[in-house]
């Protein structure tokens, strides 16, 4: 806390034209403190995507060159994400399928890589689409990529969300006060609620589903459902609060998701920035719902398979994503009309399948889970 307070004082005392430089340095120090060995990955990502944005814009009249540069940028970002997050999952499945004994790579997942790679990809795509002009000032671009409040756990901030604030922002007393309130509320959600509820879930997890009563297993998954909400929404709220203290307005990431009356509505309220990213950069480019029901279902399948994989390199995350894909398709095919008529039933239906979904999300040992479910 003392370190962060001194950082804020340093930031506030810095003249406006140097604020981005100071903020970038502070953000890189913050990242190095947590992930020093991957510092160069972050720097390389900044340099590659900064250069790609300028090159894409330079060749905006030459579509082939522009798309080639965009593809190189995307391949780079997805490449580093694959190497650090998915390569061992891939090796493990190759070994199983072909009865091989390939050695796994001894690497750990860099903090925030799933977030900042998506942010930089959206930047390059937006430049190619002509939605924005490239950022010429590399310090401004580095500020966008490295902003420490949301670097580790989101929300996913697109360049279009904060481009005006990167170039010029005002530190207003009311906004700072509001930011402090959000930060304290988010910290309370994380420390006072999520951590304590998480102790119950940890007890269930450590004991094992085969060694506890069925009611306690249900209490455990309910605890996990609450923990993941208060934990993640707490981090997002702290990030938004810190952003406001620094003069930025990050997008909202949660909007009372457990009040939803359908799975479709839940995903409009939960991790909003991730859903928005996949909608804008995957679902709509694939055709969205413009080419008939069959193509819509295919497009949704791709989005939800990728959404599951984004959360982790394990089959339970893929199954989790495909579960929600199936439910959303069923709702689109007519169930939503029934849910809209019966308020109580719609809430019960939504919570029931969310609990099933969080069970899949939380537990990779499906054999014990199925055994407990059959009791």
Where are these predicted regions, by residue range?
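Membrane-embedded transmembrane alpha-helical bundles that form the catalytic cores
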Residues: 1-372
């Amino acid at each position: 806390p003392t370190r962060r307070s001194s950082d804020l004082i340093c930031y506030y005392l810095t003249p406006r034209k140097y604020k981005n430089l100071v903020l970038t340095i502070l953000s890189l120090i913050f990242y190095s403190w947590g992930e020093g060995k991957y510092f160069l990955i972050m720097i390389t990502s900044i340099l590659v995507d900064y250069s790609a944005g300028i090159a894409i814009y330079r060749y905006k009249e030459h579509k082939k060159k522009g798309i080639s540069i965009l593809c190189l940028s995307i391949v780079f970002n997805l490449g580093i994400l694959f190497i650090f997050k998915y390569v061992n999952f891939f090796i493990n499945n190759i070994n199983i399928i072909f009865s091989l004994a390939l050695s796994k790579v001894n690497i750990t997942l860099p903090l925030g890589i799933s977030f900042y790679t998506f942010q930089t990809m959206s930047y390059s795509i937006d430049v190619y689409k002509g939605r924005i002009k490239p950022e010429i000032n590399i310090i401004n671009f580095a500020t966008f990529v490295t902003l420490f409040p949301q670097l580790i756990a989101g929300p996913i901030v697109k360049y279009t969300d904060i481009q005006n604030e990167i170039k010029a922002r005002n530190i207003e007393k009311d906004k700072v006060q509001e930011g402090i309130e959000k930060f304290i509320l988010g910290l309370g959600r994380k420390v006072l609620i999520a951590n304590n509820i998480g102790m119950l879930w940890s007890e269930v997890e450590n004991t094992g589903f085969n060694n506890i009563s069925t009611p306690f297993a249900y209490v455990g998954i309910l605890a996990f459902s609450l923990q993941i909400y208060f934990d993640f929404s707490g981090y997002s709220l702290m990030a938004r609060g810190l952003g406001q203290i620094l003069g930025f307005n990050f997008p909202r990431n949660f909007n009372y998701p457990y009040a939803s009356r359908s799975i479709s509505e839940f995903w409009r309220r939960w991790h909003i920035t991730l859903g928005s990213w996949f909608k804008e950069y995957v679902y709509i480019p694939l055709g969205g719902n413009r080419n008939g029901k069959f193509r819509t279902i295919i497009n949704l399948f791709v989005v939800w398979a990728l959404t599951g994989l984004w959360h982790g390199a394990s089959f339970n995350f893929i199954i989790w994503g495909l579960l929600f894909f199936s439910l959303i398709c069923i709702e689109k095919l007519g169930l939503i009309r029934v849910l809209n008529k019966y308020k109580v039933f719609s809430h019960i239906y939504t919570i029931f399948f969310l609990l099933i979904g969080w069970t899949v999300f939380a537990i990779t040992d499906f054999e014990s889970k199925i055994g407990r479910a059959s009791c």
